[in-house]
Amino acid sequence: MKIAVQTSLPAFQNDIGDVVRLFYGEGAAVEETQQADARLTHIHEESNGEWRETFVLTDCSGRTEQNTLSAPVVSGGLEEKRQKKRLIKRCCYMLLKRLSGRQPAWGSLTGIRPTRLYYQQLENGKTRGEARHTLQDLFDLSQEKIDLLDEILDAQQGLMDRRARACDVYIGIPFCTTRCAYCSFSSGEIGDGRLVEPYLAALLHEIEACAEMAREMGLHIRVGYIGGGTPSSLTTPQLDRLLAHVERHFGALAEFTVEAGRPDTLDAQKLRMLRDHPVTRISINPQTMNDATLTRIGRAHTAKQTVEAYELARSIGFDDINMDIIAGLPTDTLPSFEQTVEKLLELRPENITVHTLSV
């Protein structure tokens, strides 16, 4: 079923489309001008201090079904957008749930870690029981998924730093040894490296400014993540200088991840340098263990090099390793993807992240 989505608030078009896809699958939400089996119209109104959201579904025969929800207006930046989005999605969700007869296990949630919502409820002073009711009443989570969240929270007790005035910092290194065919990130080939030193100088200055800003705001920096690009495309001295600067200005971190990224950028010297700093976690990202596919997408390493880099990291003492793979790469097939997964499972990294190719 294809549903043409029309809204008076274009900024929320994709959010409404996410809800449509919950019930009718990928490709169900289409532009208003495209041929569709039904039209979903969203009307936003604001009066007397209330938001009023109405969704009307009209089928090809002209028959209509609708749902309306209201809530007090919330003013102020990000929180205003968040609360308005929740109301819009909830109103749309309730209508489509009624008409489709379907019950998504995660309710109306799309594109968010549900544990974050659970923690937010607890940080706002609610008991676990009250937080569970909120997740069920506001987001329509199934009992099974709420129980799963409880299990996750129990497992994380003592591991998570939930100070209200805490923040996490991402540090981007926009350089790679080669550019992958599918890549849409703001990164480029490192080439002769002439841009690295000017970038590092600016980055070190920004780290100092970020640390000072956190102090002024009373924020504790909890987690650090250096990603890219490929951070390990920097030379060992360059990466050493960056890590020392992070330690000096951010202090002790509960978790500190460095994307070691491509196996061909790693050697014993660089891995030992990472280990000498308080790096608690690294990523070694093959994307696929199929050599033909690696060549096709522009990766300059082999599956064998991935295994060698992983085993070297283990021998140097890294006990928390993530490995990224991508499903749907050019020339990759279901059997070859299954082989990639099987090879990674044999290595037994602490975490495997599976991305789907998006062009």
Residue ranges of each PLM-predicted region?
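N-terminal [4Fe-4S]-dependent radical SAM core
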Residues: 99-103, 123-169, 217-218
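Conserved non-cysteine loop/helix-boundary elements of the Radical SAM core domain that shape
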Residues: 187-359
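Short N-terminal binding/cap micro-motifs at the start of the first secondary-structure element
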Residues: 11-16
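Accessory, often N-terminal, substrate/partner-engagement and coupling regions
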Residues: 77-103
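Local cysteine-cluster metal-coordination motifs and their immediate loop/turn environment
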Residues: 171-187
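Short, well-ordered secondary-structure micro-motifs within conserved domains or adaptor modules
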Residues: 2-3, 20-22, 26-79, 88-89
